[in-house]
């Protein structure tokens, strides 16, 4: 990667998240907007990326072909859909480009493809790029070690009506952080739905509840409930800009890294706390 500014390409440039990513890339020192991508046939092709994001003219036009811009970026930032992200991953692996992946909803095969690609390129892959959420994940590990063996653990998440996967990637990351702290596998202890005559709560499980409504950016709560008291740890996002800033910060952090799979805890050095 280049020693000067890190040049980033933004996937899904015309979407809600894509526009925020463009704004964040233009604002962060050490980062240069190198390319912006949209799907073939989009009415936004040929638009100036900065003007599209409400940030003024940049001279970077929205393209549909990665081949056309492969010499214009060092790190590809992708918050799109799993199938599109995996296509972009193959291209970046072939051409030695770093990636920041904020796409959620991957199946196990998709996650394995990301792990495999990290043998050749540097990737930051996270369910949530908010600093606050990642601090919360660390707090959940600590709380689980103290309270997890004797409390009922529930994770409640809420997002806007347009979100297509459930539970959210962040909710799953919360469950994984708690399960890991308890030396469990989330696959063995997660309960994703309750309906009808369920019987009493099974001890040692981690429950998930999902809300989809309106324009909620993202709210997540983990509950450790006992008889007589409960601890709740909550994060609420009021703007997608917090995710965009974290993603662009991650792209900058990848400077000088040739390969490896990282997450926001690496970027923020939370593993040493």
Curated annotation (Swiss-Prot):
For the ligand (NAD(+)), the binding residues are 15-17, 38, 80-81, 102-104, 126-129, 163, 243
Task: Provide the protein's localization.
Answer: Cytoplasm
Q: Answer yes or no on keyword Oxidoreductase.
A: yes
For this chain, the annotated S-S bridges are none
Catalytic activity of the protein: (S)-2,3,4,5-tetrahydrodipicolinate + NAD(+) + H2O = (2S,4S)-4-hydroxy-2,3,4,5-tetrahydrodipicolinate + NADH + H(+); (S)-2,3,4,5-tetrahydrodipicolinate + NADP(+) + H2O = (2S,4S)-4-hydroxy-2,3,4,5-tetrahydrodipicolinate + NADPH + H(+)
The protein's matches in InterPro entries, at most eight in alphabetical order, are given as: DapB_C (IPR022663), DapB_N (IPR000846), DapB_N_CS (IPR022664), DHDPR_bac (IPR023940), NAD(P)-bd_dom_sf (IPR036291)
GO CC entries:
cytosol
Q: In which pathway does it act?
A: Amino-acid biosynthesis; L-lysine biosynthesis via DAP pathway; (S)-tetrahydrodipicolinate from L-aspartate: step 4/4
Q: One Pfam family, short name please?
A: DapB_C
UniProt GO MF annotations: 4-hydroxy-tetrahydrodipicolinate reductase; identical protein binding; NAD binding; NADP binding; oxidoreductase activity, acting on CH or CH2 groups, NAD or NADP as acceptor
Q: So what EC number does this one have?
A: 1.17.1.8
| Induction text | Expression of dapB is up-regulated by ArgP and is repressed by lysine that prevents the binding of the ArgP activator. Thus, ArgP contributes to enhanced transcription of dapB when lysine becomes limiting.
Q: Which UniProt keywords apply?
A: Amino-acid biosynthesis, Cytoplasm, Diaminopimelate biosynthesis, Lysine biosynthesis, NAD, NADP, Oxidoreductase
Annotated residues for binding of (S)-2,3,4,5-tetrahydrodipicolinate: 160, 169-170
Q: Name one GO biological process term.
A: lysine biosynthetic process via diaminopimelate
Record annotation: effect of changing residue 159 to A/Q: 135 to 200-fold reduction in catalytic activity
Checking PANTHER family in the record gives:
4-HYDROXY-TETRAHYDRODIPICOLINATE REDUCTASE 1, CHLOROPLASTIC-RELATED, DIHYDRODIPICOLINATE REDUCTASE
Provide the function of this protein: Catalyzes the conversion of 4-hydroxy-tetrahydrodipicolinate (HTPA) to tetrahydrodipicolinate. Can use both NADH and NADPH as a reductant, with NADH being twice as effective as NADPH.
How the protein assembles, per its UniProt entry? Answer: Homotetramer.
Name by which UniProt lists this protein: 4-hydroxy-tetrahydrodipicolinate reductase
As recorded in Swiss-Prot or TrEMBL, the protein's gene is named dapB
């Amino acid at each position: 990667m280049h020693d000067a500014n890190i040049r980033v390409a933004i996937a899904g440039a015309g979407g809600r998240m894509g526009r925020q990513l463009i704004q964040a890339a233009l604002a962060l020192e050490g980062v240069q907007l190198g390319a912006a991508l949209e799907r073939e046939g989009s009415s936004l092709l040929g638009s100036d990326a900065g003007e599209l994001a409400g940030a003024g003219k940049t001279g970077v036009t929205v393209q549909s072909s990665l081949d056309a811009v492969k010499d214009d970026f060092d790190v590809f930032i992708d918050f799109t859909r799993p199938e599109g992200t995996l296509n972009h991953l193959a291209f970046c692996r072939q051409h030695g480009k770093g990636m920041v992946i904020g796409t959620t909803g991957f199946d196990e095969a998709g996650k394995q493809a990301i792990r495999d690609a990290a043998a050749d390129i540097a990737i930051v892959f996270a369910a949530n790029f908010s600093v606050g959420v990642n601090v919360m994940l660390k707090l959940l590990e600590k709380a689980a070690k103290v309270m997890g063996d004797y409390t009922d653990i529930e994770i409640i998440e809420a997002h806007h009506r347009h979100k297509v996967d459930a539970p959210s990637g962040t909710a799953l990351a919360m469950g994984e952080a708690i399960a890991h702290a308890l030396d469990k596998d989330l696959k063995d202890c997660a309960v994703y739905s309750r309906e009808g005559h369920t019987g009493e709560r099974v001890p040692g499980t981690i429950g998930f509840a999902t809300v989809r409504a309106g324009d909620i950016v993202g709210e997540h709560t983990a509950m450790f409930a006992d008889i007589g008291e409960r601890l709740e740890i909550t994060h609420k996002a009021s703007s997608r800009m917090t995710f965009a800033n974290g993603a662009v910060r991650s792209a900058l952090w990848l400077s000088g890294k040739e390969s490896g799979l990282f997450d926001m805890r690496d970027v923020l050095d939370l593993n040493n706390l």
